[in-house]
């Protein structure tokens, strides 16, 4: 019988419970079994190995527009070669070859008016699905002929019209004059459908990102603060897919990059090496198998004495300024005894590593004091003055861009030794090239007397000559003023020769033989050296080479492989 509110407990059950508790207490002092029991034949699966190549670089900052002077950098060249489509690319010997990834073909189809017809592949498209078409050609043409601070615009300014058919896949480009260098045009096409109406316009194009791409790789991460860019295989690319899953560009100091090569965290490096880092690489090579190659860029460091500046209109003042400079010392300061020290630039137009380069340097032996005196200046308080005003020059360089800032400070120091006062002005690159040096500003801008800036040759040296030293172009169908060259130089005595070289009426070599002596005498530019990077490659990164001239190593990244991956 059960009482209300309780239950009767049997004595036997209590005995069993006590026994169980004793057993549990006894077990609690025994060490716990191992978390992973040792089982014969069991293997631990390693962490997945990424099929990638990590490349150490000096910097990853933008802008990334390869068509602007402000965008010229190692990383811009690398990204453009992998992400943007081009009508032609450089072959191993530097000659242009049609890029069959983009085009079916391209040829001159009419002599009068001079017309080039491009046939675009039907399957060529941007990463957002939009077709690559005539509007991309039109957008680049319109911007290159009219915007300030662009690279080698002279060829684009010969184009008078662009028409299309077959849904924009057949593009006809009409020129005002014959243009033998037409193959240098329409490289690194940009997505017009995304950029033409974008906020900020051309000045903001590719400042810190790529809105769409059309190459073997696409951008996964572009993190400037962290100093890392991750490119991944573009699954939308219509041609042979890249062998790697990813290419990583990683910013570090050169000592940190050497450490990363030593540990294998980086499999390659592309850096503007100096004497110290060259020694570090030599030391590393004693214990680590590696290969190295010098990679010259399409960029020559130059000092411009700008006739556009009121204080520099007199050729004798420009001659005095350049004569006050020690070229050897400037080259040593800019190259820091790295690979570029062997690429001294003694010609005004063609860079040292390009076919057709011939040294033409003509030093002016006239003393600085004599030239300034002839220009009307007199010594005063350790300096030079004319009409009661001291000669004091502004020396500009793109802010944060080496070796230009270093060279600019050396220019200031050397001028001071001759009593010529100066100050260094470092300006954001977009502002320096797009406003201060273009001659198109509608508001007051800083007057730049001397500019330490690059001279860039994108493939057609005749266009480089016309762009750097030709007189300001005049296009009747453009309402805004066409930018002048960076120095503001114009000499009618050589202008016809410059135009004839551009249109093929005279050989470039003959034109340079006439023009370069005038350029040296006019003291407009003092070229110093060609910029060069150093490529370092470990055996883990396969098929990595210096690449075609001026294309850069990453132009071949679609064929790179990672050992054992």
What do the predicted segments below correspond to?
Residues 29, 34-39, 325-356, 369, ...:
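Detector for C-terminal structural segments
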Residues 54, 133-140, 170-174, 216, ...:
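Alpha-helical secondary-structure segments
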Residues 54-111, 142, 212:
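N-terminal lobe/hinge region of extracytoplasmic solute-binding protein
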Residues 93, 187-242, 246:
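Gly/Pro-rich hinge or "lid" segments in bacterial periplasmic/extracellular proteins
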Residues 105-149, 169-172, 311:
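Aromatic- and charge-enriched surface segment that lines or borders ligand/interaction sites
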Residues 119, 153-199:
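Surface-exposed binding/hinge segments that line
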Residues 220-230, 248-313, 319-320, 332:
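Extracellular/periplasmic solute-recognition and catalytic clefts
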Residues 224, 378-454:
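Ligand/substrate-recognition segments at binding pockets and active sites
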């Amino acid at each position: 019988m059960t009482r209300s509110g309780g239950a009767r407990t049997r004595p036997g059950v209590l005995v069993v419970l006590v026994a169980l508790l004793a057993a549990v207490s006894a077990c609690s002092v025994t060490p716990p079994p191992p978390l992973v029991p040792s089982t014969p034949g069991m293997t631990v699966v390693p962490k997945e190995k990424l099929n990638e190549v990590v490349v150490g670089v000096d910097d990853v900052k933008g802008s990334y527009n390869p068509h602007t002077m402000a965008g010229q950098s190692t990383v811009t060249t690398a990204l453009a070669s992998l992400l943007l489509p081009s009508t032609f690319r450089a072959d191993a010997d530097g000659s242009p070859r049609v890029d069959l990834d983009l085009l079916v073909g391209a040829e001159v189809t009419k002599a009068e008016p001079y017309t080039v017809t491009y046939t675009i592949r039907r399957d060529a498209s941007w990463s957002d699905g939009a077709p690559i078409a005539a509007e991309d050609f039109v957008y680049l043409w319109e911007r290159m002929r009219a915007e300030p601070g662009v690279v080698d615009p002279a060829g684009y300014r010969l184009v008078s019209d662009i028409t299309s058919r077959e849904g924009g896949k057949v593009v006809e480009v009409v020129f005002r004059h014959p243009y033998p260098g037409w193959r240098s045009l329409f490289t690194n096409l940009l997505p017009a459908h995304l950029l033409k109406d974008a906020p900020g316009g051309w000045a903001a194009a590719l400042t810190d990102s790529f809105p769409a791409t059309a190459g073997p790789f696409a951008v996964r991460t572009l993190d400037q603060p962290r100093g890392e860019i991750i490119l991944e295989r573009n699954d939308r690319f219509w041609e042979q897919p890249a062998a790697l899953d990813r290419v990583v560009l990683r910013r570090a100091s050169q000592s940190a990059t050497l450490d990363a090569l030593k540990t294998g965290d980086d499999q390659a490096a592309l850096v503007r090496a100096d004497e110290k880092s060259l020694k570090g690489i030599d030391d590393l090579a004693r214990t680590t198998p590696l290969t190295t190659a010098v990679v010259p860029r399409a960029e020559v460091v130059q000092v411009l004495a700008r006739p556009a500046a009121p204080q520099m209109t007199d050729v004798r003042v420009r001659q005095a300024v350049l004569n006050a400079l020690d070229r050897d010392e400037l080259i040593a300061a800019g190259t820091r005894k790295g690979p570029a020290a062997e690429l001294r630039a003694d010609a005004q137009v063609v860079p040292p590593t390009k076919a057709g380069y011939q040294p033409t340097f003509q030093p002016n032996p006239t003393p600085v004091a004599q030239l300034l005196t002839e220009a009307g200046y007199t010594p005063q308080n350790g300096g030079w003055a004319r009409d009661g005003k001291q000669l004091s020059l502004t020396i500009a360089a793109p802010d944060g861009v080496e070796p230009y800032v270093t060279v600019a400070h050396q220019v200031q120091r050397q001028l001071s030794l001759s009593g010529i006062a100066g100050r260094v002005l470092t300006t954001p690159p977009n502002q320096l090239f797009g406003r201060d040096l273009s001659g198109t500003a509608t508001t007051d801008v800083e007057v730049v007397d001397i500019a330490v800036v690059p001279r860039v040759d994108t493939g057609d040296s005749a266009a480089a000559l016309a762009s750097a030293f030709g007189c300001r172009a005049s296009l009747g169908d453009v309402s805004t003023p066409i930018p002048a060259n960076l120095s503001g130089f114009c000499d009618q005595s050589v202008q016809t020769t410059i135009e004839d070289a551009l249109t093929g009426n005279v050989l470039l070599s003959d034109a340079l033989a006439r023009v370069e002596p005038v350029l040296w005498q006019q003291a407009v530019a003092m070229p110093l050296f060609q910029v060069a990077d150093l490529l370092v490659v470990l055996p883990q990164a396969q098929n990595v080479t210096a690449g075609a001239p001026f294309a850069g190593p990453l132009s071949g990244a679609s064929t790179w492989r990672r050992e054992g991956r």
